[in-house]
Amino acid sequence: GDRKAQDEMLHAAYESGVAILTTRTTAAHAMSYQITKKLGAAHGHACMLTLPHLWAHLAAQAEYQPMLTELSRILGGEKPMDGAILLKGLLAVLELDKIPMPDDATLDMLAASVNPERLGNHPEALTTAQLRAIYVQAFTPMTDTERAEAIAAWEQYGK
C-alpha cells in the first residue's frame, strides 16, 4: 500500500517500455517468452538460460571478441568468455541450470516462435537453426568440470 513506491514502479515500467520501443530487446529476452509460457520458467530465469550461450555464439567470432572482452572486464574477468562463465556460475549456484531438455517438437516450436523484429538489438541476425542450437545448448547440462569452473567464477566475483 505504499503510494510513492507504486508511483515509482509505474514510472519505471513506463521508462522500460520506452527503452524497449527505442532499442528493441535483447536476443535472450526475445527467446524467453515461450520458455516461460510452455516450460513454466520465470521470465528472468528464461533469459538467463540463453544469455551465456548467446554470448558464446558471439565470442566464437573474432569481430565480437573486443566487445565481449570489455564486458567481461566490467564483470571482473579478462577473456571474452569470462562473462558467460560467470553467468553460468550464477545459474549453477542458484540451482537454476537444471531444466530438462525439451523434446524435438518443443525445441522446433521455441526456435520458430522468436520474433525476428525482437532480435533487432542483437549484433547479428540469427537464423531459426541458430536459435534452435542455442536452445539446445541452454538445456544441455554442464559437465561437472564446466559446472565447477562456473561456480568458482561466481564465487570469486566481487572479491
Q: Model-derived features: where do they sit?
A:
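Intrinsically disordered or highly flexible coil/loop and linker segments, enriched in small
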Residues: 19-25, 80, 96, 100, ...
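Gly/Pro-rich interdomain helix-loop hinge
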Residues: 38-39, 44-106
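Glycine-rich phosphate/pyrophosphate-binding beta-alpha loops
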Residues: 14-44, 116-121
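Short alpha-helical scaffolding segments that buttress acidic/His motifs in well-ordered protein cores
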Residues: 9-17, 51, 87, 91, ...
